[in-house]
Amino acid sequence: MPERVWDRFLTEQDRSHLAMSARRRIGFGRKPALLLIDLYRWVFGDRPQPLLEAIKTWPGSCGLAAWQAISPIQTLLQAAREASIPIVHMTGLDHSGIEGWTAWREPPQPAAPSPEADDRRRRRWDIVDEVAPLPGEAVLRKSSPSAFWGTPLVGHLNYLGVDTIITCGESTSGCVRASVVDGCTYRYRMIVVDEGVFDRHEAAHAINLFDMNQKYADVVPLAEVLDYLAKWRAGQNQKPPS
């Protein structure tokens, strides 16, 4: 079995337990959608930098892990567009007078922030150009970790007949996990793209992928998702016109 990113964090007892209990895969369904979670400027900054350097100007940065995920996400996004499946981009809710869940943890803002700091805060929820939405792709804003809480996502997906949600974005241990758990609760088949999610903490990234894979989702390599989308697209093309 190929090594997984979480393997080096498992204890001997963990490994023994896994060997004794076979895990049944969730599998792909009949109608997929792609959910891109929080691919905004706040976690990328303006250029690739190591985490400890990047957070000096972009406190929410995920450092180089964010930039390393761009290419796989672009590949996934292109495949989803070619297959004509529903695509939903999630980002933060801002300029609304509503405090998000991070308000208590954020350091106090200076009474008169510098023009540069003010500009960064204005741009923080802007989805980065590399994976920007195209016209016709849904963009939803959220004020909580889950893509489902307080948003019309469920109604949108149900209307479209979606039963499978392919997920990428950040952070693995935060908004991705929260969205995956809620998606599972709503009885969607949740698929997490291994190379398409990232976190600022390596251990949190690995163990949350392990936990989601055990309980709520299938964590699968990009190649497997691309193969599924290609087959799904071919199947759609063979259907007689309605």
Please provide the spans of the model-predicted regions.
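Short hydrophobic beta-strand that contains or immediately precedes a catalytic carboxylate
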Residues: L35-I37
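A basic- and aromatic-enriched beta-loop-alpha substructure that forms the phosphate/nucleotide-
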Residues: V88-D94
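Short, conserved micro-motifs enriched in small and acidic residues
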Residues: G63, W67-I70, S173-G174
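Cytosolic catalytic domains that perform sulfur/thiol-centered chemistry
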Residues: G29, P59-A66
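A short, N-terminal amphipathic alpha-helix
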Residues: W67-P86
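A substrate-binding/cap region within the structured catalytic cores of diverse enzymes
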Residues: T102
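Active-site-adjacent betaalpha module
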Residues: M1-A33, W42-L51, Q78-A83, H95-I98, ...
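A solvent-exposed, charged loop/short amphipathic helix patch at secondary-structure junctions
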Residues: R47-C62
